């Protein structure tokens, strides 16, 4: 071939500045593009052999070599694939944006598996100019009579092409790095980048350093054809003792060779996700997880995706074990295209809530743009996301049905993920509705229907404690007869009545309320995660007639002693009288005060805040509006409940003009506040001082 020079067939001379600054967001991505081209060349050659159009040499093993040379400031990518003729160089290299892979598939679409061809974009080779001032190509085609070709370009639109001296089939691309990118010919940096993008490419990838001084010792029988022998190491002779008489005889060890350090194999050509789930062991799944995510905490469980129709998708999703107190929930879903790494956490393909997991997904059918770094947001991509969501929901539902005990163990770890998924995806929420669990006060895990079946109090206890209008005990049989007479009316009212599920957000802070509930044989569920509040709001919207109420939002009838109407009237009068004293002592006219006969006689006072008001306060805190008056929104403030069964409340009721009445009122209020929420600094200072005064009174 006569030497040739010319201009690249492009639309604009500004193509290289665009490639360098815009086409690829990560400059190290040229590694992926050039190695992918080499893998494609190897795959194509193997396909031609399978179709009978070429015979591979005996013992052929496809490979791509990455060779760093810090002294010459070069980076070389070498493959033993099908190579190129001068015409193909003209077509695939000199005409930018023409894809060799696309042309190859079109020609052999009836004979080959096009899914195995990685390259789609034609511009991949030109990513080399992101880091190189000059690029050389040396190539020799597999075709009979083909001549080697040498091609050069200095990053402008001019190139030169002539006969080359390459003698082995394949392609070698040499990058002469610019001064700003010399880090890429560092062996450690090269290893890092190749592992990042090419850890699972289907062709073996080797990394080496040109003219390395490093050596290794091997046995003579382990020598490979490409090994460079630096020294033959003669075996040592040693004395061997046999029998009674010691005789020196030569006992030779195997002959050894000192060779230049071999290229390092970087990738795994058959990653776990390419296998059928039935072929994978638990230990293989765990090893893969540790290797890919550098997380040595064992995952809870995993889902192996394996789909061939209507699109090709494989992958493994792991549910990591999360320390809820100390760790943020951040996952990583690695997206691959034919075992070539594309990016982490691409939201167009991976549903947002699944980004809390760790895993890999490989989909050869993904419609990528020219840089392979983004996805076209189309209907196909949406179907992929829907399929992944469905598989995750099916796995969780199946686990709950077939192994509820194991599902219960996982629940605390996976509940934030599932609840987030329900908030973000209506279809996922619909599938998971019957498999969402709630942990109750006894540590049992209940479904939503099971929570709704919890009775508010023990019916037998109601019968035993029933009294008439005058406070006299009523026999249980009378209660039953009366209940039967009112049954039809109650059934009608029950249909309209909201079903309340009580919940706890802080088991320590709300311990007094929990003890009261347990004493009354009532139950509540534990909701301590930040996501629980928006989640229960969604449940209320989707399930008519269900209401969630925090355990300290109100004093239910089940926590009160049964009283006659006469006693209720007396308490109302007491409340009116004592309310004036409390408001005066607290210097607070807005507080609501109630007097109730609580079953637990050890509790003197308690604070309640309606569910609506508390949620409004939480919302205001979220939007940085703390301290706003609830009444402006139609909400109620705090209510102070005084227990008429407690001696202190009885004392101030009878001694409202007493010397210490106001001090006792203040102490009752602060004790109630402490059980509800922490006191602010000023209130705590006063509380401590007052407590000391009370103890001083006890010493007199």
Language model features: what each stretch is:
Residues 1-179, 183-184, 192, 199, ...:
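GHKL (Bergerat-fold) ATPase N-terminal catalytic module, capturing the glycine-rich phosphate-binding loop
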Residues 117, 135-158, 178-181, 188-700:
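GHKL/Bergerat-fold ATPase module in large chromosome/replication-associated machines
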């Amino acid at each position: 071939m006569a030497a040739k020079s010319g201009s690249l067939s492009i639309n604009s001379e500004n193509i290289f500045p665009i490639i360098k600054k815009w086409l690829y967001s990560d400059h190290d991505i040229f590694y992926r593009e050039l190695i992918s081209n080499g893998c494609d060349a190897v795959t194509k050659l193997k396909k031609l052999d399978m179709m009978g159009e070429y015979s591979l040499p005996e013992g052929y093993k496809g490979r791509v070599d990455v060779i760093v040379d810090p002294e010459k400031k070069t980076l070389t990518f070498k493959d033993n694939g099908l190579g190129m003729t001068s015409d193909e160089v003209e077509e695939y290299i000199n005409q930018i944006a023409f894809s060799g892979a696309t042309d190859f598939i079109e020609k052999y679409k009836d004979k080959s598996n096009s899914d195995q061809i990685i390259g789609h974009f034609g511009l991949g080779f030109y990513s080399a100019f992101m880091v190189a001032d000059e690029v050389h190509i040396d190539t020799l085609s597999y075709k009979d009579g083909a001549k080697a070709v040498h091609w050069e370009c200095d990053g402008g639109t001019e190139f030169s092409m002539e006969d080359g001296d390459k003698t082995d089939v394949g392609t070698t691309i040499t990058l002469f790095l610019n001064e700003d990118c010399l880090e890429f010919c560092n062996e450690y940096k090269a290893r890092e980048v190749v592992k990042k993008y090419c850890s699972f490419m289907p062709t073996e990838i080797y990394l080496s350093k040109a003219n390395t001084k490093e050596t290794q010792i091997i046995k003579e029988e382990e020598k490979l054809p490409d090994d460079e022998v630096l020294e033959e190491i003669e075996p040592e002779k040693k004395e061997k003792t046999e029998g009674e008489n010691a005789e020196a005889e030569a006992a030779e060890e195997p002959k050894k060779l000192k060779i230049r350090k071999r290229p390092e194999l970087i990738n795994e050509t058959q990653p776990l996700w390419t296998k059928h789930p039935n072929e994978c062991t638990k230990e293989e799944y765990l090893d893969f997880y540790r290797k890919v995510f550098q997380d040595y905490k064992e995952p809870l469980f995993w889902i192996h995706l394996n789909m061939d129709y209507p699109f090709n998708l494989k992958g493994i999703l792991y549910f990591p074990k999360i320390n809820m107190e100390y760790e943020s929930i951040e996952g990583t879903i690695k997206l691959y295209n034919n075992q070539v790494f594309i990016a982490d956490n691409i939201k167009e393909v991976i549903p947002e809530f699944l980004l809390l997991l760790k895993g890999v997904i490989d989909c050869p059918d993904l419609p990528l743009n020219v840089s392979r770094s983004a996805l076209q947001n189309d209907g196909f991509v949406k179907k992929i996301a829907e399929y992944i969501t469905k598989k995750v929901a099916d796995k969780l539902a199946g686990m709950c049905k077939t192994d509820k005990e194991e599902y219960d163990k996982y629940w605390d770890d996976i509940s934030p993920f599932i609840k987030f998924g329900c908030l973000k995806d209506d279809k996922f929420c619909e599938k998971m509705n019957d498999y969402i669990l709630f942990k109750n006060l006894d540590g049992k895990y209940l479904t939503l229907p099971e929570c709704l079946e919890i009775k508010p109090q023990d019916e037998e206890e109601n019968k035993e404690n029933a009294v008439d209008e005058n406070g006299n005990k009523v026999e249980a049989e009378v209660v039953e007869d009366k209940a039967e007479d009112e049954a039809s009316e109650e059934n009608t009212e029950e249909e309209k009545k909201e079903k309340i599920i009580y919940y706890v957000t802080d088991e320590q802070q709300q311990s007094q309320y929990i003890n009261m509930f347990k004493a009354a044989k009532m139950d509540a569920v534990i909701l301590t995660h930040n996501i629980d509040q928006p989640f229960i709001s969604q449940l209320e919207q989707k399930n008519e007639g269900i209401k969630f109420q925090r355990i300290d939002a109100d004093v239910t009838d089940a926590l009160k002693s049964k009283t006659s109407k006469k006693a209720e009237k007396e308490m109302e009068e007491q409340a009116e009288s004592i309310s004036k004293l409390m408001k005066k002592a607290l210097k607070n006219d807005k507080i609501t005060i109630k007097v109730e006969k609580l079953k637990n006689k050890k509790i003197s006072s308690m604070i309640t805040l309606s569910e609506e008001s508390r949620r409004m306060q939480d919302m205001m805190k979220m939007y940085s509006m703390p301290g706003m008056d609830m009444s402006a929104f139609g909400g109620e403030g705090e209510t102070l409940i005084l227990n008429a069964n407690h001696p202190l409340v009885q004392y101030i009721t009878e001694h409202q003009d007493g010397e210490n009445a106001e001090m006792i009122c203040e102490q009752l209020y602060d004790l109630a506040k402490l059980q509800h929420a922490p006191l602010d600094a000023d209130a705590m200072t006063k509380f401590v001082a007052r407590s000391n005064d009370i103890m001083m009174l006890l010493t007199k």
